[in-house]
Amino acid sequence: MMRVKAKKALGQHFLRDLSIAERIADTLSEHKALPVLEIGPGMGVLTQFLLRKGHDVRVIEIDGESVSYLREEFPELSDRIIEGDFLHYPLSELFPGGRQYCLIGNYPYNISSQIFFRLLDVREQIPCCSGMLQREVAMRLASPPGKKDYGILSVLLQLWYNIEYLFTVDASVFDPPPKVQSGVIRLTRNDRKELPCSEKALKTVVKTAFGQRRKTLRNSLRGILPAGFDRFDEPVFSKRPEQLSPDDFIALTLLLQQ
């Protein structure tokens, strides 16, 4: 049986612990009616449990060596193994007509944040996303307001998803072992259908505010304030960005658009 050599340039760290792989697969147990897209399956340690548990699985893998291994190891998946880059692949071709599906994966550390920005672009089709990533990033995504981990992605994802930090995974169960611990999270889409403000404006406010997170909003947002803005007496401007909830950022954006 062939094996795949982990490639540092692709951020590959292959999970060896089968019990952890099964626990990750179980994070989608309430969504078996929906197809699943696994990102970066590597040698299929998670894939095998998704299949055993009855999921309709598709996988997308950028590494040609891993793709060859998967096609040999999982012949029943041959037409559902996509060789490509999740960040740029036209996902509407896999799930046309707005079809709902779930995401899962042992996400490459070097692009984990980019994966979740891509999730935001296709969120209307994804009611649940779970998987493993660098613990620091996982904690950041799930962080509530007021914590040092709370940041841009925390706000933008929590606008649309409820995020749970499920458990920590030690570096020793990977080949090769990463230099940091990993964390498993689950995102479940909330009931929000649309925003009462411009989404583009909201993203600008959030990114600008956290770009100078030690400053109060009165100072950090000066560069994007509309001409003649005179509402600095509002209490929100004396706060720092990590003190604002996602809904607070919506209210702030509406205030700036008045």
Swiss-Prot record:
Recorded GO MF terms: 16S rRNA (adenine(1518)-N(6)/adenine(1519)-N(6))-dimethyltransferase activity; RNA binding
Q: Where does S-adenosyl-L-methionine bind?
A: 13, 15, 40, 61, 85, 106
Query: Superkingdom of the source?
Result: Bacteria
UniProt-listed InterPro entries: KsgA/Erm, rRNA_Ade_diMease-like_C, rRNA_Ade_Mease_Trfase_CS, rRNA_Ade_methylase_Trfase_N, rRNA_adenine_dimethylase, SAM-dependent_MTases_sf
Q: Does the keyword Flavoprotein apply?
A: no
Which terms are listed as keywords in the entry? Cytoplasm, Methyltransferase, RNA-binding, rRNA processing, S-adenosyl-L-methionine, Transferase
Q: What is its EC number?
A: 2.1.1.182
Record field: catalytic activity? adenosine(1518)/adenosine(1519) in 16S rRNA + 4 S-adenosyl-L-methionine = N(6)-dimethyladenosine(1518)/N(6)-dimethyladenosine(1519) in 16S rRNA + 4 S-adenosyl-L-homocysteine + 4 H(+)
- What top-tier enzyme class does this entry carry? transferase
GO-annotated cellular components: cytosol
* Location(s), subcellular: Cytoplasm
User: Which Pfam families does the entry link to?
Assistant: RrnaAD
Cited SMART domains: rADc
| Stated role | Specifically dimethylates two adjacent adenosines (A1518 and A1519) in the loop of a conserved hairpin near the 3'-end of 16S rRNA in the 30S particle. May play a critical role in biogenesis of 30S subunits.
HAMAP family, alphabetically? 16SrRNA_methyltr_A
Family assignment from sequence similarity: Belongs to the class I-like SAM-binding methyltransferase superfamily. rRNA adenine N(6)-methyltransferase family. RsmA subfamily.
Q: What protein am I looking at? A: Ribosomal RNA small subunit methyltransferase A
Which gene holds the coding sequence for this protein?
rsmA
